[in-house]
């Protein structure tokens, strides 16, 4: 009797292992087949600062040439184009709401105007540009050449000693019909510390070079040279291998040289010159 009980117990133990071991192996295999989730914070890119960085260098180049304060140029671009996101900026690369034709090109769009204290919507022609930089160039030249009926219309803007004086001059010169225009421009300058760009930067040059990213490039693309304070990493240079690029700005600091480039007339960012292959002019 004792032997029968012992045999029965051994049988039950054997059955237990026969069932439990495959089940355990199945659970283990199922667990291992699932991807291991690692907690990872996605680094958010400050698109507003990237927009400022993309324009600040060229704004300083124009300041040296035309004496339009960079803080005013950038603040107007922010206000008029909604950080480059407006329909006018998207369709015509027009950052400043400049009306009329540019070299025979324009778009017709609705716009709000204030007349005799009342706001109304009208349809008007706006200048169409190939690039944001072309829009900035024309904006600076507008202040220099004035209008057909008043060549000195914007002279007070050029003579302003600081952004507050320049913003007031914009208002009194009739650049915009918004009665709060000067206050809005000054507020943007102060919020984003744009007056830090109000100086000539001899390390910056405007260039026009056809180029490509080297296949072996391991560098990153930045919102401005990575050696500058608060520069933002945008992507890897490998993202643009095989694409034609246009180098539009050059910055040299000691032995370090950086290029700002665009693709299909769209600004991309800054990259170390060692990642770039300049094509010879044909």
Curated annotation (Swiss-Prot):
Cofactor: Mg(2+)
Domain GW: 203-281
CC terms in the record's Gene Ontology section: extracellular region
Keyword annotations: Cell wall, Cell wall biogenesis/degradation, Glycosidase, Hydrolase, Magnesium, Secreted, Signal
Enzyme superclass (EC): hydrolase
Activity regulation (record text): Inhibited by EDTA.
GO molecular function: amidase activity; hydrolase activity, acting on glycosyl bonds
TM stretches of this protein: none
InterPro entries, A to Z: Glycosyl_Hydrolase_73, GW_dom, GW_dom_sf, MGlyc_endo_b_GlcNAc-like_dom
GO biological process: cell wall organization
EC number(s) given by UniProt: 3.2.1.-
pH dependence of activity: Optimal pH is about 5.7.
Pfam families given in the database record: Glucosaminidase, GW
Induction text: Expressed under control of sigma-A RNA polymerase.
Signal peptide: 1-29
Cellular localisation: Secreted, Cell wall
Function: Is the major glucosaminidase responsible for peptidoglycan structural determination during vegetative growth. Catalyzes the hydrolysis of 1,4-beta-linkages between N-acetyl-D-glucosamine and N-acetylmuramic acid residues in peptidoglycan. Acts processively from the ends of the glycan strands. Also plays a role in motility, chemotaxis and cell division.
NCBIfam families reported in the protein's UniProt record: GW_glycos_SH3 (NF033202)
Similarity comment text for this entry: Belongs to the glycosyl hydrolase 73 family.
Name the UniProt record assigns to this protein: Exo-glucosaminidase LytG
Gene: lytG
